[in-house]
Amino acid sequence: MSEEEPEFGEPEFLGWHLLRELKNQSDDQISRSKFLKLCCVADRNLLETHEYDVGLARYWYMYGELTNEHEFSGRFYNAPQAMGWDGQQYIPKSLDIEAFDVSKEGFELITDSVEWTVREFGRENVEAIKQHQYEEHAENSFIQEYSELRWLLSTIDLGSQQRLENFTEGGTKETVESNEEYLRQKLDTMVGAYPEDEGRHEEMKALYLRWDDTVRLMLDQSVQYSRIAEFLDDFIFALSRVVLRFDYSQHISDSRLADWEEDAADVKSDFTNNVQETRRELLGNRSRSTELDGVSRAYSRTIEEQIERLRSH
């Protein structure tokens, strides 16, 4: 062992070893999102398989878990600009094992879980890792439901808004419902799955129901699904910043939680304004549509009366 005190602990060893194993598997660039998500996958495997807790700081955000890299004790990686896409690529630094304060048991178990993670997910893209996380580790069914709705919106032909093809239990393809009907069913399922009296969810319930009603107004007016998808993303972003990262997290420092609290208030206020402005626009459109319908009906009656008069002469 070096005479100097180790610079890093077990959470950092998990992240460093993960980056090394990913690089050994492939020369592909490692994105920030992939790295932070796979740290969580490895940590969960440690806890579930070995009941070993390294103290990794992680939290639920949008469609899956992320490691809070600000809680690492130091930088065991370099993060230069990625080549070919926006963002950073993560590269492990050249370090000796002595730089990490890791027990013998921890070394063996972390190594085992990291190697399992790389075998299972190293060649997967971020979307596949997200899907694994919300299918296997979502803290409640509501998270799964909104994740599935987002996936659904991403698969619809946004230009034609054609009907969805559904599959029966026997695998027979049939088109039973319109997109609108199917989306309304998914919204109903989400409302039924919204957590009751659970953590900070209650703080967002009234705003969530107002958002839900606004989406239904969008469907009434045949708003493009791309806009509905954006509005869903707005909600999931707000829910993540106001509720999820607080209720479903571990080993987050008090100072970081305090920063999150300040941010949550601003995000909730912005989202409230977003919902109000969107509703105002939609209700205005509906009012104008009603007026035009009235004019159209009056015009039709006038034409019918003129036709009747012509027939009588």
Could you describe each region identified by the protein language model?
Residues M1-H313:
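Domain-edge interaction signal
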